[in-house]
Structure formats: C-alpha cells, structure tokens
Amino acid sequence: MLSVWLRVIRVRFLLASVIAVSVGLALTWRQNSSIDPLDAILIFAGVMALHASVDLLNDFWDFKRGIDTKTKRTKMSGGTGVLPEGLLKPSSVYRAGITFLIIGSVIGSYFVITHGIIIGIILGFAILSIYFYSTKIVDSGLGEFFVAVKGSLIVIGTFFIQSGEITIESILGGIVVGVLSSLVLFIASFPDHDADKSKGRKSLVIAVGKEKAAKLFWIFPLISYITIIIGVSANLFPLVSLITLVTIPLMIKSGLGLRKNFDSIENLVPFMSSTLMFSRITGALFVVSFLIVL
C-alpha cells in the first residue's frame, strides 16, 4: 500500500522542489555563511507537503474528468495510473491531497507569523494555485507559467525566510529553477496532447500545435543558461556556477530528440527522461556551485 501512495504522490518528481529549496538555502549560505537548520527543515517539510498536494489533486481531477482513462501512460506522462487501475479510491486521494495542503498551509502560516506579509503573499498564491491548478489554471493554458512561478517563489521564499530580504540573486536563482521545472512539464505534455485537448485542457503544446511547440523547447534552457551567465557576469553568482553549462550536450540531445519524435509517444519517452535528467542535473550543479569555496 505504501508503494501505491508513493506512486500517486510521484515521489521522484518531488526532487524539483528539493532543488528549489536547496538553491534558496545555498544562496543564503553563500551570503551569510550560515542558515537556520530548524527553519530549513520546516521549509522542506512545508514545500514537500504542498508539492505532494498538487500532484494528488491533479491525479484526482484528471481521473474525474476522464483524462487519465484516455491517455497512454508512460513513466513520464499520462498520470500515475493509480486511480484508473483501482488501486486507491478517488475520495482517498482527494482527502490526502487536501490533508497535505493543510499541512503545508499550517507550516507556511508559522512563517507568516514569524516573517510577515511577504511570506503571506507567497503562501496565499501557493494555496490558491494548488487548489485550482488542475481545473482553472490548466484549462486556461497557464500550467507552464504556474510551474515556473512556483519554482521561483520557492527559491525567493526560502531565501527570504533565512535572510530576511529579497535580493537580485534570489530572483535570478528563482528564474533558473522555475524555468527548468517548467521545461519538464512542457515536454511531458506532448504525449497527453490529444486526451487533454478532448477534455478541454489547454497547454502550450495544445495552443501552438506539436510541431511548432517542439521548436519552442530551446527557449527554456536558454533562459536558464542566460540567467546564470548574467548572474556570473554581474558578480551575483560565483564563477563556478558556469559548471551548469556541462549539461549542454544533454540539453541538445533532448531537444533534437523531441524535434524528431514529437508525434511518437514510444520514441519520445527516452527524450522526456533525458529532459528530466537535464533539469535535475543542471539544478543540482547550480546548488553545488554556491557551496564551493574557491
């Protein structure tokens, strides 16, 4: 039963939020040479709870709307398959999603009390967007934008809780992380195009079509790379942050693979996986770059 719950929560995709929090903490460490360990633990717990919540509620609503019964599931797309396979009751998944949302909100409320209105604004955005993500947000074509903003706010919020300020470094760091996370959602939406479109969902891929969308792939990594280069050039990021550029070959492999196989689910799966690897490795190297003392 535990394995089923871990599957529906999409544990391996939680790494995106782990990286986002880690970037915020690493930026704080580079600036102040210290972090508050208790606050760091609470931030991780709160962010993980909110991330689990959005995945659970997304699985619930996709099943209720009949999307997951029409998609061809892969390890990267098409939902978790838990509800279509009858492994859990929809009501149980919904209640779990709300429970995690409450847990994350309670932890976030603590930081609102201790750190003020800025965290309150971030928390309010998180709660509303999580609850309405699988209905209002994705139906309006804002899924990729939401994920990018979510990742950015995790970095900014973490840094603010630890340092008491919002800096250009934290904003740029947030952009890097947010766009990398958005890229994973973007490429994973290709196999779900037909099912999503038939049920009224919208995405960037649906808006412009698969062929044109495949050409937009490059925009995401370019934004992240350019942001890092700007940060290094402006002395906001350490020179060693350029280590993230070692993932360029993986990015090129993924982009070319998408361009060639955007309309073939089976052939696209390896390139969805390599895109996930690109995003996570680039993010992890970005974190490490702030911890290396040269």
Question: What would you call each of these model-derived segments?
Answer:
Residues 1-42, 46, 138-145:
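Topogenic membrane-insertion module of multi-pass membrane proteins
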Residues 4, 79-168:
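Intramembrane alpha-helical segments
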Residues 18-24, 146-160, 206-210, 273-286:
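Small-residue-rich segments of transmembrane alpha-helices in multi-pass membrane proteins
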Residues 23, 33-57, 120-131, 169-187:
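Membrane-embedded alpha-helical segments that form the functional core of polytopic membrane enzymes
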Residues 25-45, 105-120, 155-175, 226-240, ...:
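Helix-coil boundary and interhelical linker segments in multi-pass alpha-helical membrane proteins
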Residues 49-74, 183-205:
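Acidic (Asp/Glu-rich) catalytic motifs at the cytosolic membrane interface
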Residues 71-112, 205-237, 276-280:
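Multi-pass membrane catalytic core of lipid/isoprenoid biosynthesis enzymes
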Residues 233-294:
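Extended hydrophobic alpha-helices typical of membrane-associated regions
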